[in-house]
Amino acid sequence: MRKLLKFGHSMTAITFLGSVVVLWVFHQQLPAPSDALEVYSAQRSAMERVASLVLIPSLLISLLFGLASMAAVPGFHGAPWAWGKLVTTVLMLEGSLLGIQSPIKREAELAVAAMTDGDLVGELAQKLAAEQWSLILIGLVATANVALGVWRPRFRSRATPAS
């Protein structure tokens, strides 16, 4: 059971980080909406699908595998690194919902609307830098989360000599 939980947790973590990278690549390839609105809209729709169908579900399933592992393995109950992973996962979930998935979804909807209403083109691509920074920060937190699971630091304070 323990190996199955670890395997599931590892696979979903790989999927999550992979989807962050895919979204980053899409961001780097976005054309200016005023130059190629159809391409911009298509890419934004693809990004929305990646965020909704891969990024968020993989993170939620990874969280469930991690919680199940914490419940099933008594050694994880008091391990500071395990609690650190839980905290970083909650940060990743909130950051992914608020900083990645929601803005991508809004922009995809706006891009589709701009296809029929040309006046909306000027409202597109206003927050690209914020989305890119969200991807970078969430990617770094996810990397720290993986590092905690791999190296499992003890976080023990050094004993002070008795006087």
What is each stretch, according to the model?
Residues 1-163:
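Polytopic transmembrane helical bundles with strong interfacial aromatic enrichment
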